[in-house]
Amino acid sequence: MATSLTSQLENLRTSAARHLTVEKRHVSLLFDRKEANKLSNETAHRIGVAGLEQMKRIDPVFDTEFANDLFSEERVDFVRSMLEKGANEELNKQIEKLLLELSPYLQHFACQQVLEFLIHTYQIYSFNAETLLLTFLPFHETKVYSRLLRILDFDWKRSKEWQFMQQFTKTETPIPFTSIARATLSSKHSIITCITDHIRHAVEIVGSDYLEIKHPILFNFHAKLLLSMFTDPEKVDEMMLAKLMPFIENGIKSPMKSFRYSAMVVISQLVLTVKLKDEVLNSMCKLLITKMRSDTAAASLSTLMVVFQQQNVQSLSKNTLKKLLRHEEGIDVWKILKELSERTDTTKFFNVLWKELIVLSKDAESEDNTLAIDVLIETIEDASILTGDQAGTILKLILQEGMDGNIFDNKKKLKSNIRAIGMRFAKQFDAIHAELKAKDKKTLKNVLKEYQIEDIVQFASEAVAATQSEESIEIISEEAPSSKKIKLTASEKAQKLAQSSEFAKREVFSGDPINKATEWLNGEKWDKVEWALNEMAQRGEKYFSRKVEDDVEQFVLEIVKVVGVGGVKQIDGGSVKAALAGANLNPQFVADLLTKFDGVSEIAPKRTKGAQKKNLVEKTFGTEESWEAFNQRVVFVLDLLNARQIIPSSEKVLAALFAVVKQVNSKSDVESSSYQQHLAVNAIRKILEHPEKTKIGASEVDMDCVIETMRSTHNHHLLRDCLRLIVAAAKHTPNSVVKHVMSVFTFMGNGMLRKDNELTLSIVEKTVESLFSTIINSSGQAVLTKQQQTEKLIELARLFAASAIDIPAHRRARIAQAIARAVQAENASTVVLVLVSSFCARWQRSSDAAAQEAMKRGSDQDAYDDLAIELLSALNPFEQLSSVLEMCEYVRRLGGDKPAKSTTTKKDLDTMIFDRTAQTLPRIRHFRYVVVTLISRIFSNRVLIERLAAYDDEELLKNALPLGKRLIECSVELDEFANKEANDQDGSDPQAQRYWVAFASRTEVVSEKLRHLLPGGVAARLIADVLQECVNDKKMSYKMCEKVLQLANIKLGHDRYLFADSGINEKELITLAQALNKFIVAETKSEEKMRMCQNSAYTLKLIAKNLPSQSESLVLADTMQRCVSIVSQYQKLDENLTGNVLLLAGELIRSHNMRSTIHHATSLLKTCLATVQECIARFSKPQYDSAASPGSSVAGGRGNRGHRIRQQSLGGNKFGSDTLLICSLTCIQRVYDQFASFVVESTGDVIIRYCRLIARFGDPSELLALNQPSSSTTAAFQGGSQTSGFGSKTGIHHRLSLIRRSLLSIELRVLPAHIVKTVGELKTEKKALSALFNLLTGYIETQHQQKPEILRKSVIQLRRTFVSDVITPTLIVRSQERQSDQFENVEKLEHTVFNFVISIASILSEVEFRTVVNELVAWAEPGLEAKADLAARLRLVSLLHFANDLYTSFNSLALPYFGRILEISALVLKKCNATLLLGTDELLLSGKRGSIEALETDLALTLAIDVISNAARHRDFFTVDRCQLVSDVIVNELVNTKVEGHEKRCSDHLVPAIYRIGNADPDSFPELLNKIMLKTRDSRAKIRYRALIVLELLIKEIGDGVQPHLSILLPFLNELIEDENKQVEAQCQKVINSLQHKFGETFWSGGSSA
């Protein structure tokens, strides 16, 4: 019954009913709940209107009447729940339309503003919840949709479709599409039904056109959801298909294009996923054909093809076929099918279609039989698009029908189509003919005759004639065709066969081939001419050498005239080329053949003066020759010339060829003659490659013409030929080619050279490579020396550099790689240096600072840098390293600002690269700096790093070891060079000094990269070798040692091992540690040895960190012994050295729990504590604040770069002046982390130093957050051993936080004695004591989380000790530090003490903690005695402070301890009232204004009032007796004006106390109020004034509740309205105004008359 009733009530719970409840639900899309509660109707309306105005600018559809109506001013206070059903339905229509129009813009903030108004005013989150859910569902993966779901008032449990969304509303996370897809399958596809219905409903509201234009995301989501159902083919069952088919049908029939496309995509995916039954397939095909629309006809037919390809469709229904034949006029089905046939396989479709068409054509009763034949003919009209299977199918169908008596008469087009198919697909035709011939040979013959394709049978038979048997050969004599067949032997057969061969029957050529050919040309006997041409080709050059030149030229002219210009096709061009390939042609004759003789042509050669015989070519072709004929002649002649191995060459021939190229360039339609250009350019290239005796120079090679052709051509073959021509020309005229080479590099022009495609780029790339190789190696017949080759390379590279900035950025890589392949690794660095030199030669210093900054990394430098980096990237990594080394050495050879005196041959090449004598000093400096910067970029190149990483350890050692030591040496030399130049600056030139400092920094970066780029294995070997040399050699290279140690540090610190694959061998690490131990000595004199000791300590620290933990190691034990020995002498040693050794010792303690570390832990800790104490003494505030910068303490200043390096850790980070302190703290922390139980006796000293450092370097409250054991900072700092990375206070704070963490883990039983000692030691240091109690509070909280029971028992035992020996001795500070400037600090100290007491209270029960409170009360209570001294009386202040802190933390839980404290508060108020107590002896506390005594008295009164005020909050505790106890003293405080701060005390503290007392005892409030009003009759104006202030504030607190007490107030106010003191009168008027504001104007008029 209960269940039924619940169900009925739930059904009645409508949206309107829910909004009629007492509490209105505050819902917002843009604001959180707290802000939504404050959102007024007017504000929501303004937000909505602002959003609507913005949406109108985005989409004009929002500028409509209904929108204005929805957003009108009248709707501000609209209450939807009061609407009737009809009005609500009408409103729903308006809202649904607006939501549909908003949905595409959900992620626009203006849309969210509109939704905010609709949610607030129309409660659409409840009334239109499902509409909101569906409308914006396509945005399910956005945050805003998640927020929208969260605010919906939707019954998720009752909705089977959307129940899955409830889990996402709780977390407010976006909904993945996979979740929706799973829910769709689990809900039996009802979600798809909902979305489809939503789309239909949307069409009814906004129309299909609007929906299709504005909501593509909705259709995409619908289709995507449908497709998701096919991801698992096993789940596609009958039920799913039954659900899907209606969606598909509705989609195909839909007038909306997007819906149709969605349905087609679903069909395609469905047929690809599963095999469908025939009835389903027929239904789909029928839908696609019968519901085809013009705008999606191509897509429908494409989908149909997919169905036929993937499924086995056997037939089409008659009605479907008729619909296909009688399609709409706007749909050209057969044209679309033809286009599809060219792109995809349509075999299955046409096989079925043709079969159905033939069946329909036989139906005499059908009106479509003729149309079927027409369509059949149209679909087989183009045989070129048919496949073999299609051809076989159509041939078999038509021939089979013919054999069955169904001949398509009077269809000439069909006969021609069948014939074309049979000819094109002879093999298929032959197979079908053989198949049908076996059935009925005679009938088939008649059918073939009827279709007039009998000859195709013979054609097909000949095609397979090769399969005839050779067992018997029938030889029939030509002269005796009727002779009998003779059976011959094998030898006789062979002899007869040879005699009957074509070779035996060949006629023997007699006579001169040229004369015969000329005779046959005139007689147009073309086969004979070709015979003669073949004879010429066989006779070859010997034949032509015996012929007269004029005869040969005359014959060539005849051939050109007949074949080239006349266009005779019977003569094969190949025969002509072969025949004339050996002819010795005069270069002048060749030039004439390529010339047009019209008297005005620009390409005609100049004639010499005097009489001259008429040119034979001109005589043949005349001056009236058309350009078309001339072009035909030129193409033919060029074709002949290109067929020759060597073309007759001369200056005139080259000029004529270039003239042909130019003539084509001058045409508007250049591409139509690209073949002619192609032939001409190839001919020029052949001449340049084989010039014979012709001298070719710059004047003969028209490079301008070639470049112009390259710029304008769109033919990649011609482009390739032109680039090859440039390479060939480079052998003869390198200077001219180089001058024009810019166009090659910069891709100028508007033709194909400009295109960004692989073909163009590969052509240019190969050309550039060949060009460089050719120019470098070409020098006539002489063999170039190495230096000559380098000189030519420098010259070419400099010319290339001039055009480098014009090369597009995306093409630079390929060009640079091509150059790298040409110049090889040995010359790569030279090219790079020339590039940089060219850039710096053009560089100008800008006077404008902003422009100079912009020029630092301008586009020009980017271009040069990119080319250089890509050029080197083409080399293998070891070649790259070698090239970079050469560049570094070049920089070093270049020298400083002053040039070197001596020069060598090597210097000559250096000068060619960069001639410093021809450059200004700024450019020399810039060149040097740019080279070093470029080297840095090369080392940072990811390609180099990845290639090195691809090698294994063995290959790296083999290839890189020879380079390794040189890399180290080079880095040292670079460093020393920069250091020397920087130190040589005397300061007279600030600009030079700045430059060399910057250059030194840059070289340092390069040096580091040089070293650190070395692979791990090579680095390990180098480090071992160098250190061994340093140990064995008396003249140790400390500089080299420093570098290798830095390398070791990077490898150990970053990679954690030296070998990438196998990891470093433990034995090798120990060996390295043994070598380094020798440098760990207490050095005080040699700076190099001191620096070496520091570096070795750092490296040993990393080794200790990476070595496996060992119980005992002789090497590390020796290291530990050395560390302790050095640290013990810290007063004589450098602080940085001592700090590094301390870090090493700390790491040994942390990483290796050995006997030696335990043994030395105590002595090491004592030394660390001593150093910390000295640091604390040294870091006294005045001295510390005035201390010099860290760098100033180092001798030599910035001028000595070695000293600057010394101030840095090996990681490159600066040490501060507190280095030793940080290192000592680190070591202390390590000791306490590992061996706290062994060094218990030093705990007190550690705590003392910890507290003093906290007092000096940071506020404890700020550090508290750092030191929580559960905080993320603990985890972040756990693994670090370096301290130098933390600067100054940050590093100290970090170490102090870690020490605090260690102290928090010490057992409580050992702490009390140390805490008591600490309190005694720090009794005069307030900040240090605050740090101590912060530590104790943290300790209690930490232990309470980890060991609550053990802690509770320990605290119970130690609570009295804590009060007597820790807490109360600290609170005495108030009586000892009685200075005004320390007053606030004392308060802060007490606050930290009481925080500790409160932390104890949190773990004890009420009874257990009462002992602590009683102890404190007993400690303070003697201060109330008359004879008590000032120190005892000040204890009362501390007690009241504690009471208020206790209440703040525990509220009402603190009241059980307030009994006696409340009484003490009343007594304090009474005994501190200087107005009522006339004698000073009777006063508890008193003092003159501005004195410390006045501050203490004011504080005591304030705390006492607050105690009473806090107690009065709780009626149960604040009984009538207690109310009476405090009422008089509280009211009497009104007259206590003699104590400083009276007015503030009254307004801020006294008024709340009185108000709360009145609330606690309402019956006594009138009496209390009357006592207050009686104070207004005091003779002292100040008291009257203060009483009125209290009254005014009290009325504000009470509010309307003051009305019952007006009868008490009015008489007193009447008296005061005309007070003799103007200030009192004004304050009285303010009180009256306040009452008038509450009770009206008539209030006071009535009261005054009364």
UniProtKB/Swiss-Prot annotation:
It is found in: Nucleus, Nucleolus. Residues 1183-1210 are annotated as: Disordered. One of its GO terms (biological process) is positive regulation of transcription by RNA polymerase I. GO terms for cellular component: 90S preribosome; small-subunit processome; t-UTP complex. HEAT repeats lie at residues 1609-1645. Coiled coil: none annotated. Keywords: Nucleus, Ribonucleoprotein, Ribosome biogenesis, rRNA processing. One of its GO terms (molecular function) is snoRNA binding. Its main location: nucleus. InterPro entries: ARM-like, ARM-type_fold, BP28_C_dom, HEAT_Utp10/HEAT1, U3snoRNP10_N, UTP10. The keyword Chaperone does not apply. Belongs to the HEATR1/UTP10 family. Involved in nucleolar processing of pre-18S ribosomal RNA. Involved in ribosome biosynthesis. This is HEAT repeat-containing protein 1 homolog. The lineage of its organism: Eukaryota, Metazoa, Ecdysozoa, Nematoda, Chromadorea.
